[in-house]
């Protein structure tokens, strides 16, 4: 194996841009920014979305577009003899 061809694998702090929560993880990503985390200074990477702010993980996920499309379809074709699963 060749020496010194792999990037440095080090501890990095990822910061959620919308909530400000910090996550410590190992990564090869580089950054000039630094931040303090639990008394130590680490390179900082700002993220737009993390598990702290993503709707899937926060439980604030909305299905309005899909639900609206299904309701619109059911209303449009209600008179054609199609039955809903609830009617069976």
From Swiss-Prot:
GO molecular function, one term: structural constituent of ribosome
Stored InterPro entries: Ribosomal_bL28/bL31-like_sf, Ribosomal_bL31, Ribosomal_bL31_B, Ribosomal_bL31_sf
Keywords for this protein: Ribonucleoprotein, Ribosomal protein
One of the GO BP terms on file: translation
SUPFAM superfamilies: L28p-like
Cited Gene3D superfamilies: Ribosomal protein L31
Keyword presence, Ribosomal protein: yes
A GO cellular component annotation in the UniProt record: ribonucleoprotein complex
Family assignment from sequence similarity: Belongs to the bacterial ribosomal protein bL31 family. Type B subfamily.
Subunit structure: Part of the 50S ribosomal subunit.
Protein name, per record: Large ribosomal subunit protein bL31B
Designated gene of the protein: rpmE2
């Amino acid at each position: 194996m060749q020496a010194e061809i792999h990037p440095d694998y080090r501890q990095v702090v990822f910061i959620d841009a919308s909530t400000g929560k910090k996550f410590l993880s190992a990564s090869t990503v580089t950054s000039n920014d630094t931040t303090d985390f639990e008394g130590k200074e680490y390179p900082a990477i700002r993220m737009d979305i993390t598990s702290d702010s993503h709707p899937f993980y926060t439980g604030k996920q909305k299905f309005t577009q899909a639900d609206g499309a299904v309701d619109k379809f059911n209303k449009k074709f209600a008179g054609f003899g199609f039955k809903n699963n609830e009617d069976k």
